[in-house]
Amino acid sequence: MNPIRKIIHIDMDCFYAAIEMRDFPELANKPIAVGGDAKHRGVIATCNYAARQFGIRSAMPTAHALKLCRELILRPVRMDVYQKESQYIRSLLTEYTDLIEPLSLDEAYLDVTESTQCQGSATWIAEEIRARIYQTRQLTASAGIAPNKSLAKIASDWHKPNGQMVIRPEDVSAFVLDLPVRKLFGVGPKMEEKLGALNIKTCADLQRYSIEYLLQKFGTMGQRLYELARGIDNRPVNPERIRKSISVEETYPKDLPNSEACLAVLPDLMARLEARIQRAGKISGIHNLFVKLKFNDFQQTTIERVMDKIDLIVLRQLIQEGFARRGMPVRLLGIGIKLKQENTYQSVQLPLLDL
């Protein structure tokens, strides 16, 4: 019988913004954001909690953020600095386990099931890691401790900033009952809306539906919903995880009737893609661009082109070519980049979006 796993999710608090406030103390307690210049149609990569009180969030166009908060202090992205801090923190984590799965520069999963550090207590390990990060880097981190990855990630967000939460194995069944379905991995606003139409607001509501019904209603996602609603997630912490692509997509409440409508929403998708790329940090370089369209008959097409940078004109062309394949209203539109896989560990910084 396999031992109950001890999974920790470490999530740095407002990582980029926190580094800016540490390096420039005069910014403390002021609303600040890290991102691109509004004059060049930049987007917010992250912001501190003071800025979030104004409704500012990551992936928001900088121009809109400045309208929400005229006092917002905009800092340029210093990716080399953030990467250096991330590397230091990563090296610290390796003192506790070799089973580390980085998700981005500022978060990672740790499997400490077999660790003998801190008398084998995952709770104490998380506390010690957070304390050492603050003592050595003057940065705060939040942590979630649970028997699996999904619950650990949910827990790390529970007492942010600078807090941690433990979900014990014996408490999982009770914990998930009142958990809003929007907290589940893969449940975005659109899926939450679909579940809400079935009067599913919590995991307890979701548990009332059979696996057969959920599979019929939501396809493969139905299996995932069935398991997550019961606190089940058997995915291992994967140290060899290599990112192959970065993408964003949106399912629209009203179908996009023509290619012009698809092109009209492209700037928003590009802003979100840029923010996601910035969050990923150092990557191995771009191999190609791709566009995905799902039509209102649920048929799907993907079209791509070899490119070493993101180009708005090329994305517009791909959307037009993809739409022409069926010429029907589009219910889902996505854009993304595929990454070079050779020399993965000789990664280079992503060039800025070519607008």
Swiss-Prot record:
Chief localisation class: cytoplasm
**Could you tell me which residue ranges the UmuC domain spans?**
7-188
Q: Which InterPro entries match?
A: DNA/RNA_pol_sf, DNA_pol_Y-fam_lit_finger_sf, DNA_pol_Y-fam_little_finger, DNA_polymerase-Y, DNApol_IV, IMS_HHH_1, Rev_trsase/Diguanyl_cyclase, UmuC
Which annotated residues bind Mg(2+)? D11, D106
Q: Which Gene3D superfamilies does this entry report, sorted A to Z? A: 3.30.70.270, 3.40.1170.60, 5' to 3' exonuclease, C-terminal subdomain, DNA polymerase, Y-family, little finger domain
Q: Which GO MF terms are attached to this record? A: damaged DNA binding; DNA-directed DNA polymerase activity; magnesium ion binding
Q: Which UniProt keywords apply?
A: Cytoplasm, DNA damage, DNA repair, DNA replication, DNA-binding, DNA-directed DNA polymerase, Magnesium, Metal-binding, Mutator protein, Nucleotidyltransferase, Transferase
Cofactors needed by this protein, per the record, are:
Mg(2+)
Matching SUPFAM superfamilies: DNA/RNA polymerases, Lesion bypass DNA polymerase (Y-family), little finger domain
Q: What is its EC number?
A: 2.7.7.7
Q: Which GO terms describe its cellular component?
A: cytosol
The UniProt note on the cofactor reads as follows: Binds 2 magnesium ions per subunit.
* Pfam families associated with the record: IMS, IMS_C, IMS_HHH_1
Q: Name one GO biological process term.
A: error-prone translesion synthesis
> Which reaction is the catalytic activity of this chain?
DNA(n) + a 2'-deoxyribonucleoside 5'-triphosphate = DNA(n+1) + diphosphate
The catalytic site is made up of: E107
**UniProt-annotated location(s):** Cytoplasm
**Site entry (Substrate discrimination), positions:** Y16
Entry's family note? Belongs to the DNA polymerase type-Y family.
Q: What does this protein do?
A: Poorly processive, error-prone DNA polymerase involved in untargeted mutagenesis. Copies undamaged DNA at stalled replication forks, which arise in vivo from mismatched or misaligned primer ends. These misaligned primers can be extended by PolIV. Exhibits no 3'-5' exonuclease (proofreading) activity. May be involved in translesional synthesis, in conjunction with the beta clamp from PolIII.
> HAMAP family annotated for this entry?
DNApol_IV
Q: How does it assemble?
A: Monomer.
Q: What protein is this chain from?
A: DNA polymerase IV
Gene of origin?
A: dinB
